[in-house]
Amino acid sequence: RNNKKKYKIVAATCNTNYAKLKKLQKEYKIKKIGINNKNAAKNYISLSGSDKNLFIGNDNFSKLITKDIDVIILAISGLSPINICFDIVKSGKILGLANKECIISLGPRLISLAKRHKTKIVPLDSEHNSIYRLLETNNNKFKSITITASGGPFLHKKRSFLKNVTPKQAINHPIWK
């Protein structure tokens, strides 16, 4: 809100909160809107009186990636936005990613694709962004980085159990299923 003259929001999306999206559209004069949920999209159309520049369903969100956009913030949780994630990277746009699941499940493929398309994936989650910044500014001069976890599939497990955790167990997160 403090930088409306410096930054312009070209497109915005939501799953179901069409009323909040409509308020944001009005405040920031957003031209293109995407709504995943069909019922929410119908309600949005009733509220706004138009379906012009409205894209319905996650499958259509990639149509919002246009030349007039420099950075795309992806903040859809889970694995449902994986195709959108790939489309953003293929477009060469900078991807601000507030989603851990896409990186954890397909990180090497996404990073390789980003290099091929000469773009960046910038993690927005605070811990991941801190690591990203350290790696960017120190030219990968670290031998190892340890990330602590607050729960997931290992919540309430004893330290002795954690010594033998497999990658398969680690991705079996109760929320990511």
Positions of PLM-derived features:
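N-terminal Rossmann-like dinucleotide-binding module
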Residues: 1-31
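Active-site-proximal loop->helix
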Residues: 1-4, 23-24, 105-119, 134-137
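A short helix->loop->beta-strand "cap" motif at the edges of active sites that frequently abuts
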Residues: 29-31, 50-53, 91-94, 117-119
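Short acidic-hydrophobic, aromatic-tinged amphipathic segments that line or gate anion-handling sites
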Residues: 34-36, 53-60
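Redox-cofactor binding/interface segments in oxidoreductases and associated redox assembly factors
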Residues: 35, 73-75, 147
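Rossmann-fold NAD(P)-binding glycine/threonine-rich loop
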Residues: 44-47, 78-91, 100-120
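Beta-loop-alpha module in the N-terminal Rossmann-like domain of NAD(P)-dependent dehydrogenases
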Residues: 56-88
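Conserved anion/nucleotide-ligand pocket segment
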Residues: 128-177
